[in-house]
Amino acid sequence: MTSLSIQPFPEISRMARDLDSRKKRRISLDGIAALCEHSKEIIDSLPMLNSPDYFLKPCINELVEREIESPDYCSRVPDFTIGRIGYGYIRFLGNTDVRRLDLDHIVKFHRHEVIVYDDESSKPVVGEGLNKAAEVTLVVNIPDLTWGKQQVNHIAYKLKQSTERQGATFISFDPDNGLWKFFVPHFSRFGLSDDEAEDIAMDDAPGLGDPVGLDGKKVADIDEEDQMETSELELSHSLPAHLGLDPEKMKEMRMLMFPNEDEDESEDFREQTSHLMTSLTKRNVRPSQKIAQRNSHQDPPPVVRKTPLALLEYNPGNDKSSPGSILMVQQNKNLAVRKSKTGGFELDISHVTPLTDNYSRNVVDAALFMGRSFRAGWGPNGVLFHTGKPICSSSSQMVLSSVINKEKIAIDKVVWDRKGKVQKELIDSAFEAPLSLHKELNHVEEEVRFGSFSLKLQNVVTDRVVLSDICRSYIGIIEKQLEVAGLSTSAKLFLMHQVMVWELIKVLFSERQSTERLMYAASDNEEDVMQDVKEDSAKIDTEALPLIRRAEFSCWLQESVSHRVQEDVSDLNGSSYLEHLFFLLTGRELDSAVELAISKGDVRLACLLSQAGGSTVNRNDILQQLHLWRRNGLDFNFIEKERIKLYELLAGNIHDALQDFTIDWKRFLGLLMWHHLPPDSSLPIIFRSYQLLLNQAKAPWPVPIYIDEGPADGFVSDNKHSDILYYLMLLHSKEEEEFGFLQTMFSAFSSTDDPLDYHMIWHHRGILEAVGAFTSDDLHTLDMGFVAQLLSQGLCHWAIYVVLHIPFREDHPYLHVTVIREILFQYCETWSSMESQRQFIKDLGIPSEWMHEALAVYYNYHGDFVKALDQFIECANWQRAHSIFMTSVAHSLFLSANHSEIWRIATSMDDRKSEIENWDLGAGIYMSFYLLKSSLQEDADTMVELEPLDSTNESCRNFVGRLNESLAVWGDRLPVEARVAYSKMAEEICDLLLSDLSKNPSRETQLTCFETAFDAPLPEDVRSTHLQDAVSLFSLYLSETGQISA
């Protein structure tokens, strides 16, 4: 590694140029004593710094001057800075109390790192002393400042990673002078570990190679690695710690059992110290030379590796056996025997992080942020494993890190009963029944091609005439769900709210059948229904349709608030019948209000109540009467306040009438429609008027049902949510306009306190889109949320059905492919074990190749290679099928004599052999074997003219050559059994070849056949047998040759 000397950069030099003394930093203040009678107090309040190569800003002289000018200045020094020449500096942000700080022991700069408060026991709490936010600048010693931009960017990236891993914030890296700048919230130790320094090609020399002083001369590096304060290993890195033992106890036992050994070590320690201190007096000594000098006397202690700890608030004093860290590293501790703690890691309440108005002890969140090193992670189906406190636990008791908690996201809460158990009936009524109804509706299919495959994306189509029947069908399903035993109160509340939503959809978006539609429907049975058609068509008045819809909405609103009216009335206990009347009017229960007024003898008020919400003339008359009373100075103290409020309400002044009352948003909307706006106002005008008052903060917010009618059982976001009923009203009033509230409208919080429940909202969205209320392709959160719910209950087929209804987008063309394939692969065991689901998925038009591929991966994972092979063949993954056939299937079938199955599988891939790598050296080997074996057996059994032995031998030689080449190509991928199968094939072929050598009397040809056998991968015993036969044949050949020669 190239050595480098960096000249003192201007920033640090400028900070250090005020230093008058380079050897002693605690200056004499005799001259200053005359300036102030409290000189002794000032001297005692100053920080102490004796290290020759450290500097301060403001310097000691400036601190004295400012302390004289402004008493207690040292308790509030702005932007206090301390640094070491050639190593870096720290600028503490804000005002810092530096009184009586022993800076020599508190701040230590080393090569590529800085340590503040080495001793954890003396470190103050965060925010006090020097344990506060600061900006750190370290000098990074890179080997060559002339590197290119790519290398510099690599170093900057490594530094940024190291900074963020230690809980600090990376600011900048200046390659011109090697300055690494970052922000820290508090202190222990920050810098680069040994491994990180090696990764970014740091220089091996300690410090800055040879740090440069202010006078241009090199300063000796007095680092902690060269001082004997680190001569002994930390207990956390000792052998007992790696063996799972308590190093403190082992140290204590060693001291008790071998006291003399400690004295010997102390003697060695002193000798080693003397030797090393002598070596430190030599300047510009290479690191290798220093090590050589140490080794000349005694081997140095091994290098201590510092591994990161994951938690920022970790106190190393709590667990002596934990490894050190670059994040909150355990520093060198005294080796005095201490009593070790037997418990696990605990997070002290004093070290928690304040969040808004409370404290967080979310070890789980910290674990998920820091990663696997903190032993936390997600499993399938929303399972979380961690070592922190249970998520919903309210206990203040600390937890041990050795306790692993398993928790699961309640994505299936909608099918729980009051005891928190899943009920099959709820699964059917919440998921399967609504989806079955959705599937029965008319659909249009859009075929979209993805390469060689295609999907049939679906969309529901319907019209507003049949919307009423669809809504009634959904309501019937919900009513059956309400009959399930064991439902919690909150579950019943949400189900009733779903009924209200479907009723409102029917009121706002359905249409009555026109005359033309009735005539078309009657054409098939004209004689029977023509009279009914005429009667129905006579009743339809197009101009009256808005008023009919308004009346239906009024009835819906009366029904939805009736229970709130009864609750308010029951709270009165008959104390005031006027308040009773007022509450009845908020729900438009005019009949009951009139009867109550009559029963109390208030006949005139009953007459006014009977006309409430009617003609605006009556309202104006009451309003004029109230104005007349006020103008004439009527003393309203003689009239009940409740009666005045009734008059105000009847006059249309709903805000004056509601001064002392708090009502829900639906009743306020009703008062606006019934008593304030004209009786012929259309619904869009009513909804917009309410929205205008809402924007002016003059109307109650349309809060969701779980806030409006009681505390929610689950998690409730702090954001201001609105009820889906309100969004339906906005959607009706803005059908011809642009609207941007769909994301919020179809969020889970618009109808339930469960942020993961989308099971009914998805149907709302689908039906509203089908009738043309809106069109959107940006509601993927809704779709995927519902998919996750279905998958949590094992309803994979319905999950795929929902995916097919996601609108196609050009910017995400492969969204459907990705999601469907992920479902098939991840939940293969579920859908493949149920024939009904498998058939349902096929009927949806999902490519069978995807299903076979998922099954192949599943069977391969579980070691069922025969089934995996069949599935890979079915999905036309020929290369993968061929690989499994050769490495896992073929040899087992061959050794079990299942030759017909081998032939079937091999021939099924033979047509695609051009797509398969090494086919001739793979499955082609088996096919060649059977063909060659069959040919040799036919030659031996038939009486026809035999094939010449030369030709047969050549065929066998080619086969043997391919066997050997196949073994070389497949190598270690072939198990021992496959090699046995190869030996069996070679043995059978060689036996057939050598079984009848008499068909060719030529001894040379016969010996050539033996050469073929010797090249084959035969077992040694078989090879020995053939060798004996070959020797016999060769002897015979020699004898025959001798006879001929004689």
Swiss-Prot record:
Organism superkingdom: Eukaryota
Pfam (any one): Nup96
Keyword vocabulary terms for this entry: Membrane, mRNA transport, Nuclear pore complex, Nucleus, Phosphoprotein, Plant defense, Protein transport, Stress response, Translocation, Transport
Result of knocking out the encoding gene: Pleiotropic phenotype with diverse growth defects and early flowering.
Tissues of expression: Expressed in roots, leaves, stems, flowers and siliques.
Biological-process GO terms, alphabetical: defense response; innate immune response-activating signaling pathway; long-day photoperiodism, flowering; mRNA transport; protein transport; response to auxin
Topology term for the membrane: Peripheral membrane protein
Record-listed Phosphoserine modification sites: S523
Location (main, coarse): nucleus
GO MF entries: porin activity; structural constituent of nuclear pore
Statement: the UniProt record of this protein carries the keyword Transcription: no
GO cellular component, one term: nucleus
Localization annotation: Nucleus membrane; Nucleus, Nuclear pore complex
Record field: compositional bias (Polar residues): 283-295
UniProt region (Disordered), positions on chain: 283-304
Domain Peptidase S59, chain residue ranges per copy: 51-187
Miscellaneous information on this protein: Unlike in mammals and yeast, NUP96 and NUP98 are not translated as a polyprotein.
Record note on quaternary structure: Part of the nuclear pore complex (NPC). The NPC has an eight-fold symmetrical structure comprising a central transport channel and two rings, the cytoplasmic and nuclear rings, to which eight filaments are attached. The cytoplasmic filaments have loose ends, while the nuclear filaments are joined in a distal ring, forming a nuclear basket. NPCs are highly dynamic in configuration and composition, and can be devided in 3 subcomplexes, the NUP62 subcomplex, the NUP107-160 subcomplex and the NUP93 subcomplex, containing approximately 30 different nucleoporin proteins.
Function, in words: Contributes to the transfer of mature mRNA from the nucleus to the cytosol. Required for both R gene-mediated and basal disease resistance. RNA export seems to play a critical role in stress responses and regulation of plant growth and development.
UniProt name for this protein: Nuclear pore complex protein NUP96
Gene of this entry: NUP96
